[in-house]
């Protein structure tokens, strides 16, 4: 019986650990008969807040996420089974929202980057040859609220057209009366007759065409008199390209007389500046200098580096060879001493050995 003035505890301290253990066992047994949180999916989400555990037979429902829509009759719910797992369920019932269909632009193509119109993907546009794109080359399928829409207007393909090519001084081009040229339309330039004794030469491309981006393929050529001076090489002779006058792109070849060598190129061409390119060569007396050797073409520091490497290599080889000879010499001395001792032993008489 408790002493007077002291209340007796309703739950003796000895019984409290036992009651706590029993409650824990009861709680664990209730968890063992339950399912953990239900599975998560990319296309659908749980309706309501998840709980830490669910009773056997308890059902949870899902709904399609934003940007997805439901297509029956596939189930969007699951039930906690007797084996404490959730019955199989998938988000195949939820489909991505899709953007409106976009066909090929006139004179072009629309290419689905991922083969689908679903949001998050893109579509590319290209134009046929002879047309160019006006607008966005790529459109993205985006969500606006819960609706999928394209992020811009589809482009259009316009025909490549060129303005007339430039007119040139002392010349003309074909189709000069045409005001608009289409893709790959070509014109050819020619020079007018010259008023003097020397003709005009056409410098540049004679034919140009309307190309991509409505730009002509080459700059317009020019017509002017190009005449190079008569090339003379002392102690040499011309062997091809003979003529009294040398106009644009005239080509001449030379060779030197016996006992002389050519200093320069043996072939020269009259360029657009009325000069020979390369310059007219010279024939010098004697014979050409021999071509420089390998060492002549190297810098001084490279040659020094090669010499140092050779010296170091020779030193290493000599050191290895010296060490090898020294070991052979020591081994020979040791073998000679042993043979001499054996010879001495064999040459002594029995009496000497006993003495």
Curated annotation (Swiss-Prot):
Cytoplasmic-side positions: 322-355
Question: Locate the Sushi domain: which residues?
Answer: 35-96, 97-159, 160-225, 226-285
| Positions of glycan attachment | 114, 163, 263
Tell me the superkingdom of the source.
Eukaryota
Question: Which parts of the sequence lie on the Extracellular side of the lipid bilayer?
Answer: 35-300
Record-linked Pfam families: Sushi
Q: How does it sit in the membrane?
A: Single-pass type I membrane protein
The GO biological-process annotations, alphabetized, read as: complement activation, classical pathway; innate immune response; single fertilization
The record's section on InterPro entries has:
CD46 (IPR017341), SEZ6_CSMD_C4BPB_Regulators (IPR051277), Sushi/SCR/CCP_sf (IPR035976), Sushi_SCR_CCP_dom (IPR000436)
Q: Listed disulfide bonds for this chain?
A: 99-141, 127-157, 162-210, 191-223, 228-270, 256-283
Segment forming the signal sequence? 1-34
The answer to whether UniProt assigns keyword Disulfide bond to this entry is yes
PROSITE patterns referenced in this protein's UniProt entry, alphabetically = SUSHI (PS50923)
Chief localisation class: membrane
Supply the alphabetized keyword list: Complement pathway, Cytoplasmic vesicle, Disulfide bond, Fertilization, Glycoprotein, Immunity, Innate immunity, Membrane, Repeat, Signal, Sushi, Transmembrane, Transmembrane helix
Question: According to its record, what are the GO cellular component terms?
Answer: cell surface; inner acrosomal membrane
According to the record's subunit comment, the protein's assembly and interactions are:
Interacts with C3b. Interacts with C4b. Interacts with moesin/MSN.
PANTHER family linked to this entry:
PROTEIN CBR-CLEC-78
Q: What is known of its domains?
A: Sushi domains 3 and 4 are the most important for interaction with C3b and C4b.
The protein's role, per its UniProt record = Acts as a cofactor for complement factor I, a serine protease which protects autologous cells against complement-mediated injury by cleaving C3b and C4b deposited on host tissue. May be involved in the fusion of the spermatozoa with the oocyte during fertilization. Also acts as a costimulatory factor for T-cells which induces the differentiation of CD4+ into T-regulatory 1 cells. T-regulatory 1 cells suppress immune responses by secreting interleukin-10, and therefore are thought to prevent autoimmunity.
What protein name is recorded for this chain?
Answer: Membrane cofactor protein
User: Per the UniProt entry, what species is this protein from, by scientific name?
Assistant: Pongo abelii
